[in-house]
Amino acid sequence: NSPGVMVGTAPDASYWLIKSEDNRSEFPVEEDYWVAAVEFADSVGVDVITSSLGYFMFDTEDSVYSQCSLDGKTALISKAASMAADKGILLFSSAGNEGASSWGKITFPGDADEIVTVGAVTDDKKKSTFSSIGFTADYRVKPDVVALGSGCSVVDASGNITYANG
């Protein structure tokens, strides 16, 4: 690594930054946006997808998932994640930030069987309070792996080192 020149362990990697989230609201169409983003990623030859998005509830009462749907085969976004994995794309998905909410469980597409669902832990290896957990509706353990997610050193938009969760 050369300071200011090269940082990381994959200096020859190339990246596609694809945004599918509409920050103004939460509607089921956002699953369609996510699926379109994954389809685009596949069309340009992406090998690895990381996604911090997860859904379980939307802004309309008639479009709320139930925990019985956490089977990897019900939610559109979960089916699309499995299809991407079947095509050879390694897909990492956040377990979700619902650990302290009444939902508490992983969010979709984290329930998909063929993807890697990532949870968060503290520096003393305890589950971060916000991190979602499994089981899935069909009794699979999720998340698949965990990583430091509380009090992480990060660089902010101004280039300063600060701490954040996620």
PLM features: residue spans?
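Catalytic-core regions built around general acid/base machinery
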Residues: 72-88
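Structural detector of well-ordered beta-strand residues that form the stable sheet scaffold
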Residues: 16, 50, 90-92, 117, ...
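Extracellular S/T/G-rich loop segment that most often corresponds to the catalytic His/Ser-adjacent loop
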Residues: 110-166
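Short beta-alpha junctions and helix-cap segments that line functional grooves
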Residues: 3-4, 102-106, 129-132
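Short acidic, glycine-rich surface-loop motifs adjacent to enzyme active sites
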Residues: 39-71, 94
